[in-house]
UniProtKB/Swiss-Prot annotation:
Listed InterPro entries: SfsA, SfsA_C, SfsA_N
Family to which this protein belongs: Belongs to the SfsA family.
Pfam families noted in UniProt: SfsA, SfsA_N
Gene (UniProt): sfsA
Protein name (database record): Sugar fermentation stimulation protein homolog
Classification of source organism: Archaea, Thermoproteota, Thermoprotei, Sulfolobales, Sulfolobaceae
GO molecular function: DNA binding
Highest taxon listed in the record's lineage: Archaea
Organism expressing this protein natively: Sulfurisphaera tokodaii (strain DSM 16993 / JCM 10545 / NBRC 100140 / 7)
């Protein structure tokens, strides 16, 4: 199932990532990178990327859309995450709902949904985050509190590569987030991990993968009921 389509994409080579949100290509294009993660395995000098032309108020007129993993193109544009997630939610779901000190991505009926995008994989395991995220931990804390108050809550993780068989929080990068993820599972927060593949200009939904229960049990002595 195609869930998103880009305009024409152009292949470039990374010359430098001059800050978190700006990439310079070997052809001297200056492109916006809409992903706050480290992306060290994807955005580095000499690697291939796909860009698209954009018009707007930014100083850049192109946007990094995907990067080559060595096996496939991995989408690196977090600006489209919620649009993709909405394809799996009721049409009347409300966006950007304020809860406590945070904004939760979606709400409908008695359900709250937070969306996270994942681009990192190691040994067949999808990992999030690839950089410490206090904001991500805060979102999990809000989901836990909502669950305790009787709401249905869902953490929807969008994985933009297919070389994965299960998902785990990235303990090596952010133990606080990872421990809170475990806590969320214990509290009854639902987790859906959806896998996508870039096929030419189209993002295609490939199905779901489970949370890596065996890895979590080994890392934290946590076992699911």
């Amino acid at each position: 199932m195609i869930v998103y389509s880009f305009p024409t994409l152009y292949e470039e080579i990374v010359k430098a990532r001059i800050n978190r949100f700006t990439v310079v290509t070997e052809s001297e294009k200056i492109c916006h990178l809409h992903d706050p993660g480290r992306l060290k395995e994807l955005i580095y000098p000499g690697n291939k990327i796909l860009i698209r032309n954009v018009n707007g108020k930014r100083k850049t007129n192109c946007q990094v859309t995907a990067a080559w993993s060595g096996k496939e193109w991995v989408v690196t544009d977090s600006s489209i995450h919620n649009e993709i997630a909405r394809r799996f939610l009721p049409s009347d779901a409300k966006s950007e709902v304020t809860v406590g000190k945070s904004r939760i991505d979606f709400a409908f009926d008695n359900t709250y949904v937070e969306v996270k995008g994942c681009t990192l994989a190691r040994d067949g395991i999808a990992l999030f985050p690839d950089a410490p995220t206090k904001r991500g931990k805060r979102h999990l804390d809000e989901l836990i509190e909502l669950r305790r108050n009787g709401y249905s809550v869902l953490l929807m993780i969008l994985v933009f590569r297919t070389d994965v068989v299960c998902f785990s929080p990235n303990f090596d990068t952010d133990r606080d987030f990872s421990n809170t993820f475990i806590k969320a599972l214990k509290e009854g927060v639902n987790v859906e991990v959806k896998v996508f593949q870039l096929d030419k200009e189209n993002i295609v939904y490939k199905g779901e993968i489970p949370v890596c229960h065996q890895i979590l049990e080994k890392s934290t002595n946590f076992s699911l009921p």
